[in-house]
């Protein structure tokens, strides 16, 4: 490898040793001054990349966990909303049935009250008619007793009272 130098110009071992010592000295200076900062910088960069990867992985896991929580919350909200809707429907149905039942009970009560009122009015009308007929009979009897009537007079008297009864009843 160095044979071409030896033939034509000669190899100076002193220069070679000097260059080798300078090279080794330069390597040592680079190691002391530059190598440690460069390796430290490279290590710091590797640590930062590793931390960034770990942070990204953690963020991805957190995001996935958050997505799962949101999906669970959404499912829970949907379930709760469905429960609320079902409860509202059931309550509405129950209230409707209660209203219908109450209305039927009110109608039945009104019907019974109307029947009682009708029966009372009928009883009052019958009582009034009895009283009127009794009064009329007493009046007829008293007039008959006061005078003795012939058959034609008696018939005319009864007809006049019946006619008077019809007029009073109409008014």
UniProtKB/Swiss-Prot annotation:
Gene3D superfamilies: F1F0 ATP synthase subunit B, membrane domain
Superkingdom of origin: Bacteria
One GO CC term, this protein: plasma membrane
Keyword terms, alphabetized: ATP synthesis, Cell membrane, CF(0), Hydrogen ion transport, Ion transport, Membrane, Transmembrane, Transmembrane helix, Transport
Transmembrane stretches, start-end: 10-30
UniProt GO molecular function: proton-transporting ATP synthase activity, rotational mechanism; proton-transporting ATPase activity, rotational mechanism
Topology within the bilayer: Single-pass membrane protein
Pfam families with a match to the protein in the record: ATP-synt_B
Family: Belongs to the ATPase B chain family.
Protein's job: F(1)F(0) ATP synthase produces ATP from ADP in the presence of a proton or sodium gradient. F-type ATPases consist of two structural domains, F(1) containing the extramembraneous catalytic core and F(0) containing the membrane proton channel, linked together by a central stalk and a peripheral stalk. During catalysis, ATP synthesis in the catalytic domain of F(1) is coupled via a rotary mechanism of the central stalk subunits to proton translocation.
Protein name as it appears in the record: ATP synthase subunit b
Species per Swiss-Prot/TrEMBL record: Levilactobacillus brevis (strain ATCC 367 / BCRC 12310 / CIP 105137 / JCM 1170 / LMG 11437 / NCIMB 947 / NCTC 947) (Lactobacillus brevis)
Lineage: Bacteria, Bacillati, Bacillota, Bacilli, Lactobacillales
Record gene name: atpF
């Amino acid at each position: 490898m160095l044979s071409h130098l030896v033939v034509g110009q000669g190899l100076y071992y002193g220069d070679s040793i000097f260059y080798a010592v300078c090279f080794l000295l330069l390597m040592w200076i680079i190691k002391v001054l530059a190598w440690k900062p460069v390796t430290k910088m490279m290590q710091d960069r590797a640590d930062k990349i590793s931390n960034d990867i770990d942070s990204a992985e953690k963020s991805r896991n957190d995001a996935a966990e958050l997505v799962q929580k949101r999906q669970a919350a959404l499912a829970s909200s949907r379930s709760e909303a469905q429960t609320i809707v079902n409860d509202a429907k059931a309550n509405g149905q129950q209230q409707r049935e209660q209203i219908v039942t109450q209305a039927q009970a009110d109608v039945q009560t009104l019907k019974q009250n109307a029947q009682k009122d009708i029966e009372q009015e009928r009883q009052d009308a019958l009582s009034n008619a009895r009283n009127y007929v009794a009064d009329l009979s007493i009046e007829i009897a008293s007039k008959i007793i006061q005078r003795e009537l012939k058959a034609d007079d008696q018939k005319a008297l009864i007809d006049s009272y019946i006619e008077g009864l019809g007029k009073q009843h109409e008014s």
